[in-house]
Curated annotation (Swiss-Prot):
ATP binds at T69, G70, K71, T72, V73, Y217, R229. HAMAP family: ORC1_type_DNA_replic_protein. Pfam families: AAA_16, Cdc6_C, Cdc6_lid. Keywords: ATP-binding, DNA replication, Nucleotide-binding. GO terms for molecular function: ATP binding; ATP hydrolysis activity. SUPFAM superfamilies: P-loop containing nucleoside triphosphate hydrolases, Winged helix' DNA-binding domain. Involved in regulation of DNA replication. InterPro entries: AAA+_ATPase, AAA_16, Cdc6_C, Cdc6_lid, ORC1/CDC6, Orc1/Cdc6_arc, P-loop_NTPase, WH-like_DNA-bd_sf. This is ORC1-type DNA replication protein. GO terms for biological process: DNA replication. Belongs to the CDC6/cdc18 family.
Protein backbone atom coordinates (compact mmCIF):
# COMPACT_ATOMS: atom_id res chain seq x y z
CA UNK A 1 0.00 0.00 0.00
CA UNK A 2 1.73 3.21 -1.14
CA UNK A 3 1.68 6.66 0.45
CA UNK A 4 -0.35 8.15 -2.44
CA UNK A 5 -3.17 5.67 -1.81
CA UNK A 6 -3.29 6.50 1.92
CA UNK A 7 -3.12 10.20 1.15
CA UNK A 8 -6.07 9.91 -1.24
CA UNK A 9 -8.15 8.14 1.42
CA UNK A 10 -7.57 10.96 3.92
CA UNK A 11 -8.26 13.58 1.24
CA UNK A 12 -11.54 11.84 0.34
CA UNK A 13 -12.81 11.94 3.93
CA UNK A 14 -11.43 15.42 4.56
CA UNK A 15 -13.33 16.95 1.63
CA UNK A 16 -16.55 14.96 2.05
CA UNK A 17 -19.58 16.97 3.12
CA UNK A 18 -19.26 17.74 6.81
CA UNK A 19 -22.03 16.46 9.05
CA UNK A 20 -20.85 17.62 12.47
CA UNK A 21 -20.31 21.22 13.52
CA UNK A 22 -19.39 20.26 17.11
CA UNK A 23 -19.68 16.57 17.97
CA UNK A 24 -18.61 17.16 21.61
CA UNK A 25 -22.07 18.60 22.31
CA UNK A 26 -23.44 15.04 22.03
CA UNK A 27 -20.99 13.56 24.55
CA UNK A 28 -22.16 12.57 28.05
CA UNK A 29 -19.44 14.78 29.56
CA UNK A 30 -20.80 17.98 27.95
CA UNK A 31 -22.65 20.42 30.23
CA UNK A 32 -25.11 22.55 28.19
CA UNK A 33 -26.10 26.12 29.03
CA UNK A 34 -29.72 25.02 29.55
CA UNK A 35 -31.23 21.78 30.85
CA UNK A 36 -34.74 21.23 29.46
CA UNK A 37 -37.26 19.52 31.76
CA UNK A 38 -35.03 19.60 34.84
CA UNK A 39 -36.05 22.96 36.31
CA UNK A 40 -37.57 21.40 39.44
CA UNK A 41 -34.43 19.37 40.18
CA UNK A 42 -32.23 22.43 39.54
CA UNK A 43 -34.39 24.47 41.96
CA UNK A 44 -34.27 21.70 44.58
CA UNK A 45 -30.47 21.44 44.41
CA UNK A 46 -30.03 25.22 44.44
CA UNK A 47 -32.29 25.48 47.50
CA UNK A 48 -30.22 22.85 49.33
CA UNK A 49 -26.86 24.44 48.42
CA UNK A 50 -27.76 28.15 48.86
CA UNK A 51 -26.66 28.19 52.56
CA UNK A 52 -23.07 28.26 51.20
CA UNK A 53 -23.71 31.83 50.00
CA UNK A 54 -24.76 32.75 53.55
CA UNK A 55 -21.61 31.21 55.01
CA UNK A 56 -23.48 28.16 56.33
CA UNK A 57 -22.81 24.46 55.73
CA UNK A 58 -25.41 22.92 53.38
CA UNK A 59 -27.00 19.53 53.98
CA UNK A 60 -25.60 16.45 52.30
CA UNK A 61 -27.63 15.52 49.21
CA UNK A 62 -28.44 12.20 47.58
CA UNK A 63 -29.54 12.33 43.96
CA UNK A 64 -31.45 9.31 42.64
CA UNK A 65 -32.65 8.22 39.22
CA UNK A 66 -32.08 5.67 36.48
CA UNK A 67 -29.25 5.96 33.96
CA UNK A 68 -29.69 8.85 31.52
CA UNK A 69 -32.15 10.89 33.60
CA UNK A 70 -29.84 13.92 33.81
CA UNK A 71 -28.47 13.46 37.34
CA UNK A 72 -24.77 14.04 36.65
CA UNK A 73 -25.22 16.86 34.14
CA UNK A 74 -27.66 18.66 36.48
CA UNK A 75 -25.33 18.36 39.49
CA UNK A 76 -22.42 19.67 37.39
CA UNK A 77 -24.60 22.50 36.03
CA UNK A 78 -25.75 23.60 39.51
CA UNK A 79 -22.33 23.32 41.17
CA UNK A 80 -20.68 25.29 38.33
CA UNK A 81 -23.29 28.04 38.77
CA UNK A 82 -22.71 27.96 42.54
CA UNK A 83 -18.96 28.45 42.01
CA UNK A 84 -19.62 31.43 39.71
CA UNK A 85 -21.96 33.22 42.10
CA UNK A 86 -19.80 32.41 45.14
CA UNK A 87 -16.94 34.35 43.51
CA UNK A 88 -19.25 37.37 43.29
CA UNK A 89 -19.73 37.19 47.09
CA UNK A 90 -16.06 36.34 47.79
CA UNK A 91 -16.94 32.98 49.29
CA UNK A 92 -14.33 30.31 48.45
CA UNK A 93 -15.99 27.13 47.12
CA UNK A 94 -14.22 24.02 45.84
CA UNK A 95 -16.17 21.31 44.00
CA UNK A 96 -14.46 17.91 43.69
CA UNK A 97 -16.12 15.53 41.22
CA UNK A 98 -15.30 11.82 41.65
CA UNK A 99 -16.54 9.05 39.35
CA UNK A 100 -16.83 6.09 41.74
CA UNK A 101 -17.07 3.59 38.89
CA UNK A 102 -13.38 4.37 38.24
CA UNK A 103 -12.20 5.62 41.65
CA UNK A 104 -13.77 2.73 43.53
CA UNK A 105 -11.96 2.22 46.86
CA UNK A 106 -11.86 4.10 50.18
CA UNK A 107 -8.14 4.81 49.69
CA UNK A 108 -8.45 6.09 46.11
CA UNK A 109 -11.34 8.44 46.97
CA UNK A 110 -9.33 9.97 49.84
CA UNK A 111 -6.25 10.23 47.58
CA UNK A 112 -8.29 11.93 44.83
CA UNK A 113 -9.55 14.56 47.30
CA UNK A 114 -6.04 15.25 48.66
CA UNK A 115 -4.60 15.50 45.14
CA UNK A 116 -7.27 18.03 44.14
CA UNK A 117 -5.34 20.51 46.31
CA UNK A 118 -1.80 19.41 45.29
CA UNK A 119 -0.85 22.69 43.56
CA UNK A 120 -1.86 24.64 46.65
CA UNK A 121 -0.52 22.20 49.27
CA UNK A 122 2.46 20.60 47.52
CA UNK A 123 1.17 17.24 48.78
CA UNK A 124 0.46 14.40 46.35
CA UNK A 125 -0.72 10.95 47.44
CA UNK A 126 0.23 7.95 45.26
CA UNK A 127 -2.55 5.66 43.96
CA UNK A 128 -1.37 2.93 46.34
CA UNK A 129 1.09 2.51 49.18
CA UNK A 130 0.23 4.83 52.05
CA UNK A 131 -1.68 3.75 55.17
CA UNK A 132 -5.31 4.90 54.82
CA UNK A 133 -5.14 6.72 58.19
CA UNK A 134 -2.20 8.77 56.90
CA UNK A 135 -4.09 9.71 53.72
CA UNK A 136 -7.10 10.77 55.82
CA UNK A 137 -4.83 12.92 58.03
CA UNK A 138 -3.41 14.61 54.90
CA UNK A 139 -6.95 15.13 53.59
CA UNK A 140 -7.92 17.03 56.75
CA UNK A 141 -4.70 19.04 56.59
CA UNK A 142 -5.11 20.20 52.98
CA UNK A 143 -8.85 20.91 53.22
CA UNK A 144 -8.48 22.84 56.47
CA UNK A 145 -5.63 25.02 55.19
CA UNK A 146 -8.07 27.92 54.77
CA UNK A 147 -11.70 28.91 55.32
CA UNK A 148 -13.75 27.50 52.46
CA UNK A 149 -16.62 25.23 51.49
CA UNK A 150 -15.69 21.92 49.89
CA UNK A 151 -18.43 20.04 48.02
CA UNK A 152 -17.50 16.45 47.21
CA UNK A 153 -19.58 14.89 44.40
CA UNK A 154 -19.53 11.08 44.52
CA UNK A 155 -21.04 9.92 41.22
CA UNK A 156 -22.20 6.26 41.10
CA UNK A 157 -21.72 6.14 44.87
CA UNK A 158 -23.71 2.88 45.07
CA UNK A 159 -20.92 1.09 43.15
CA UNK A 160 -18.30 2.38 45.60
CA UNK A 161 -20.30 1.28 48.65
CA UNK A 162 -21.12 -2.17 47.21
CA UNK A 163 -17.45 -2.79 46.39
CA UNK A 164 -15.63 -1.15 49.30
CA UNK A 165 -18.17 -0.66 52.10
CA UNK A 166 -19.43 2.55 53.69
CA UNK A 167 -16.34 3.57 55.73
CA UNK A 168 -15.62 6.38 53.27
CA UNK A 169 -19.08 7.87 53.83
CA UNK A 170 -18.71 7.56 57.59
CA UNK A 171 -15.37 9.43 57.42
CA UNK A 172 -16.68 12.22 55.18
CA UNK A 173 -19.96 12.75 57.03
CA UNK A 174 -18.12 13.23 60.35
CA UNK A 175 -15.17 15.24 59.03
CA UNK A 176 -16.64 18.67 59.87
CA UNK A 177 -16.26 17.97 63.60
CA UNK A 178 -12.50 17.55 62.97
CA UNK A 179 -12.02 20.75 60.94
CA UNK A 180 -11.58 24.28 62.30
CA UNK A 181 -11.74 26.41 59.13
CA UNK A 182 -13.26 24.51 56.19
CA UNK A 183 -16.70 22.93 55.84
CA UNK A 184 -17.42 19.80 53.80
CA UNK A 185 -20.66 18.54 52.30
CA UNK A 186 -21.38 15.58 50.04
CA UNK A 187 -23.51 15.11 46.94
CA UNK A 188 -24.03 11.41 46.25
CA UNK A 189 -25.39 10.35 42.85
CA UNK A 190 -26.92 6.88 42.55
CA UNK A 191 -28.79 4.82 39.95
CA UNK A 192 -30.01 2.56 42.77
CA UNK A 193 -33.08 3.88 44.61
CA UNK A 194 -32.45 1.31 47.38
CA UNK A 195 -28.90 2.55 47.86
CA UNK A 196 -29.39 3.52 51.52
CA UNK A 197 -30.28 -0.08 52.39
CA UNK A 198 -26.56 -0.90 52.01
CA UNK A 199 -25.55 1.65 54.66
CA UNK A 200 -24.78 0.92 58.29
CA UNK A 201 -26.97 2.56 60.96
CA UNK A 202 -24.02 4.68 62.21
CA UNK A 203 -23.57 6.14 58.70
CA UNK A 204 -27.29 6.82 58.28
CA UNK A 205 -27.41 8.67 61.60
CA UNK A 206 -24.53 10.98 60.61
CA UNK A 207 -25.75 11.72 57.07
CA UNK A 208 -28.53 14.26 57.73
CA UNK A 209 -29.17 14.25 54.00
CA UNK A 210 -31.77 15.61 51.59
CA UNK A 211 -32.96 13.72 48.52
CA UNK A 212 -33.60 14.80 44.93
CA UNK A 213 -35.25 12.27 42.60
CA UNK A 214 -34.93 12.37 38.80
CA UNK A 215 -37.81 10.67 36.94
CA UNK A 216 -37.23 9.18 33.46
CA UNK A 217 -37.77 11.44 30.44
CA UNK A 218 -40.65 10.72 28.07
CA UNK A 219 -40.29 10.73 24.26
CA UNK A 220 -41.38 14.39 23.91
CA UNK A 221 -38.88 15.55 26.55
CA UNK A 222 -36.09 13.55 24.89
CA UNK A 223 -36.99 15.17 21.57
CA UNK A 224 -36.62 18.63 23.14
CA UNK A 225 -33.20 17.70 24.56
CA UNK A 226 -32.02 16.32 21.21
CA UNK A 227 -33.32 19.32 19.25
CA UNK A 228 -31.40 21.66 21.56
CA UNK A 229 -28.15 19.69 21.19
CA UNK A 230 -28.64 19.06 17.44
CA UNK A 231 -28.61 22.81 16.71
CA UNK A 232 -25.08 23.04 18.09
CA UNK A 233 -23.84 19.61 17.00
CA UNK A 234 -24.83 19.47 13.30
CA UNK A 235 -24.60 21.76 10.30
CA UNK A 236 -27.95 23.16 9.18
CA UNK A 237 -29.98 20.91 6.91
CA UNK A 238 -28.04 17.65 7.43
CA UNK A 239 -30.65 15.98 9.68
CA UNK A 240 -33.78 14.49 8.12
CA UNK A 241 -36.90 15.62 9.99
CA UNK A 242 -37.61 12.07 11.19
CA UNK A 243 -34.17 11.49 12.77
CA UNK A 244 -34.62 13.27 16.11
CA UNK A 245 -38.15 11.88 16.80
CA UNK A 246 -36.91 8.35 16.02
CA UNK A 247 -33.88 8.67 18.34
CA UNK A 248 -36.20 10.00 21.06
CA UNK A 249 -38.76 7.20 20.58
CA UNK A 250 -36.11 4.46 20.68
CA UNK A 251 -34.49 5.91 23.82
CA UNK A 252 -37.89 6.36 25.51
CA UNK A 253 -38.29 2.57 25.27
CA UNK A 254 -35.01 2.33 27.26
CA UNK A 255 -36.63 3.87 30.39
CA UNK A 256 -36.30 7.43 29.01
CA UNK A 257 -32.51 7.35 28.77
CA UNK A 258 -31.14 10.68 27.46
CA UNK A 259 -27.63 9.21 27.20
CA UNK A 260 -28.95 6.52 24.87
CA UNK A 261 -30.77 9.18 22.81
CA UNK A 262 -27.59 11.27 22.47
CA UNK A 263 -25.53 8.19 21.58
CA UNK A 264 -28.03 7.22 18.88
CA UNK A 265 -27.91 10.69 17.34
CA UNK A 266 -24.10 10.87 17.48
CA UNK A 267 -23.49 7.36 16.11
CA UNK A 268 -26.10 7.90 13.34
CA UNK A 269 -24.17 11.03 12.33
CA UNK A 270 -20.85 9.14 12.41
CA UNK A 271 -22.26 6.38 10.18
CA UNK A 272 -23.62 8.94 7.70
CA UNK A 273 -20.27 10.74 7.68
CA UNK A 274 -18.37 7.48 7.09
CA UNK A 275 -20.65 6.66 4.17
CA UNK A 276 -20.08 10.10 2.66
CA UNK A 277 -23.83 10.78 2.88
CA UNK A 278 -25.09 14.34 2.61
CA UNK A 279 -27.85 13.76 5.17
CA UNK A 280 -28.45 11.73 8.33
CA UNK A 281 -31.56 9.59 7.76
CA UNK A 282 -33.72 7.10 9.66
CA UNK A 283 -31.68 4.29 8.11
CA UNK A 284 -28.58 5.66 9.84
CA UNK A 285 -30.45 5.72 13.16
CA UNK A 286 -31.44 2.05 12.81
CA UNK A 287 -27.84 1.16 11.97
CA UNK A 288 -26.72 3.15 15.02
CA UNK A 289 -29.20 1.26 17.21
CA UNK A 290 -27.78 -2.04 15.96
CA UNK A 291 -24.18 -0.95 16.58
CA UNK A 292 -24.87 0.38 20.08
CA UNK A 293 -26.71 -2.80 21.07
CA UNK A 294 -23.79 -4.90 19.82
CA UNK A 295 -21.25 -2.73 21.67
CA UNK A 296 -23.36 -2.93 24.85
CA UNK A 297 -23.66 -6.71 24.57
CA UNK A 298 -19.91 -7.06 24.07
CA UNK A 299 -19.30 -5.01 27.23
CA UNK A 300 -21.77 -7.18 29.18
CA UNK A 301 -20.01 -10.38 28.06
CA UNK A 302 -16.56 -8.95 28.88
CA UNK A 303 -17.60 -8.24 32.47
CA UNK A 304 -19.29 -11.59 33.20
CA UNK A 305 -17.89 -13.61 36.15
CA UNK A 306 -15.65 -16.57 35.24
CA UNK A 307 -18.27 -19.33 35.66
CA UNK A 308 -20.80 -17.41 33.55
CA UNK A 309 -18.17 -17.11 30.80
CA UNK A 310 -17.45 -20.85 30.94
CA UNK A 311 -21.18 -21.62 30.88
CA UNK A 312 -21.69 -19.31 27.89
CA UNK A 313 -18.89 -21.06 26.03
CA UNK A 314 -20.55 -24.43 26.66
CA UNK A 315 -23.65 -23.05 24.91
CA UNK A 316 -21.49 -21.65 22.07
CA UNK A 317 -19.93 -25.11 21.53
CA UNK A 318 -23.35 -26.76 21.41
CA UNK A 319 -24.52 -24.11 18.94
CA UNK A 320 -21.54 -24.67 16.66
CA UNK A 321 -22.19 -28.41 16.83
CA UNK A 322 -25.83 -27.92 15.76
CA UNK A 323 -27.13 -29.14 19.14
CA UNK A 324 -29.26 -26.17 20.19
CA UNK A 325 -31.82 -25.84 21.63
CA UNK A 326 -30.38 -27.82 24.55
CA UNK A 327 -31.70 -28.41 28.05
CA UNK A 328 -30.00 -27.49 31.34
CA UNK A 329 -28.58 -30.99 31.87
CA UNK A 330 -26.96 -31.05 28.42
CA UNK A 331 -25.42 -27.62 28.92
CA UNK A 332 -24.28 -28.54 32.43
CA UNK A 333 -22.39 -31.63 31.24
CA UNK A 334 -20.38 -29.53 28.73
CA UNK A 335 -19.84 -26.82 31.35
CA UNK A 336 -18.33 -29.42 33.73
CA UNK A 337 -15.94 -30.63 31.01
CA UNK A 338 -14.81 -27.06 30.35
CA UNK A 339 -14.27 -26.39 34.07
CA UNK A 340 -12.12 -29.52 34.23
CA UNK A 341 -10.02 -28.35 31.27
CA UNK A 342 -9.41 -25.01 33.05
CA UNK A 343 -8.75 -26.79 36.38
CA UNK A 344 -11.66 -24.90 37.95
CA UNK A 345 -14.08 -26.44 40.47
CA UNK A 346 -17.53 -26.59 38.78
CA UNK A 347 -20.61 -25.13 40.46
CA UNK A 348 -23.62 -27.31 41.27
CA UNK A 349 -26.27 -27.84 38.59
CA UNK A 350 -28.72 -25.82 40.67
CA UNK A 351 -26.33 -22.85 40.78
CA UNK A 352 -25.66 -23.18 37.04
CA UNK A 353 -29.42 -23.11 36.48
CA UNK A 354 -29.42 -19.71 38.25
CA UNK A 355 -26.57 -18.53 36.00
CA UNK A 356 -28.59 -19.62 32.94
CA UNK A 357 -31.45 -17.42 34.19
CA UNK A 358 -29.02 -14.50 34.61
CA UNK A 359 -27.66 -14.91 31.06
CA UNK A 360 -31.27 -15.02 29.86
CA UNK A 361 -32.12 -11.79 31.71
CA UNK A 362 -29.06 -10.11 30.16
CA UNK A 363 -30.32 -11.12 26.70
CA UNK A 364 -27.20 -13.17 25.88
CA UNK A 365 -29.18 -16.40 25.64
CA UNK A 366 -32.83 -17.35 25.48
CA UNK A 367 -33.93 -19.90 28.09
CA UNK A 368 -37.60 -20.71 27.57
CA UNK A 369 -39.44 -23.19 29.81
CA UNK A 370 -41.37 -25.68 27.65
CA UNK A 371 -43.65 -28.58 28.52
CA UNK A 372 -42.57 -32.07 27.46
CA UNK A 373 -45.91 -33.67 28.33
CA UNK A 374 -45.50 -36.60 30.70
CA UNK A 375 -41.74 -35.91 30.84
CA UNK A 376 -42.45 -32.64 32.66
CA UNK A 377 -41.12 -29.15 31.99
CA UNK A 378 -37.62 -28.23 30.88
CA UNK A 379 -35.66 -25.21 29.68
CA UNK A 380 -34.84 -24.89 26.00
CA UNK A 381 -31.63 -22.89 25.71
CA UNK A 382 -30.66 -20.94 22.59
CA UNK A 383 -27.87 -18.46 21.85
CA UNK A 384 -28.85 -14.81 21.18
CA UNK A 385 -25.37 -13.65 20.13
CA UNK A 386 -23.02 -14.99 17.47
CA UNK A 387 -20.33 -17.54 18.41
CA UNK A 388 -17.91 -15.24 16.55
CA UNK A 389 -18.64 -12.36 18.97
CA UNK A 390 -18.05 -14.54 22.04
CA UNK A 391 -14.84 -16.05 20.63
CA UNK A 392 -13.51 -12.64 19.64
CA UNK A 393 -14.02 -11.37 23.21
CA UNK A 394 -12.48 -14.50 24.77
CA UNK A 395 -9.40 -14.15 22.55
CA UNK A 396 -8.42 -11.13 24.66
CA UNK A 397 -9.30 -12.74 28.02
CA UNK A 398 -6.48 -14.77 29.59
CA UNK A 399 -8.83 -16.64 31.94
CA UNK A 400 -10.95 -18.23 29.22
CA UNK A 401 -8.72 -18.02 26.14
CA UNK A 402 -7.66 -21.73 26.55
CA UNK A 403 -11.30 -22.73 25.82
CA UNK A 404 -10.87 -21.60 22.21
CA UNK A 405 -8.54 -24.54 21.50
CA UNK A 406 -11.09 -27.16 22.59
CA UNK A 407 -13.45 -29.16 20.38
CA UNK A 408 -16.71 -30.68 21.61
CA UNK A 409 -16.14 -34.12 20.08
CA UNK A 410 -12.66 -34.38 21.60
CA UNK A 411 -13.90 -33.26 25.05
CA UNK A 412 -16.61 -35.92 24.94
CA UNK A 413 -14.07 -38.62 24.06
CA UNK A 414 -11.91 -37.56 27.02
CA UNK A 415 -14.85 -37.91 29.37
Amino acid sequence: MDDDYLSSIFEKYLHARKIFKNKEVLRHSYTPKELPHRHKQIDDLAHILVPVLRGETPSNVFVYGKTGTGKTVTVKFVTEELKKISQKYNIPVEVIYINCEIIDTHYRVLARIVNHFKEESGIEVPLVGWPTDEVYAKLKEVIDAKERFVIIVLDEIDKLIKKSGDDILYSLTRINSELSKAKVSIIGISNDLKFKEYLDARVLSSLSEEEVVFPPYDANQLRDILMQRAKEAFYEGVLDDAVVPLCAALAAREHGDARRALDLLRVAGEIAEREGASKVTERHVWKAQEKIEQDTMEEVIKTLPLHSKVLLYAIVMLDENGELPANTGEVYSIYKMLCDSLDVEPLTQRRVSDLINELDMLGIINAKVVSKGRYGRTKEIRLNVTPYMVKNIYRHDEQVRPLLTLSLSRQRRLF
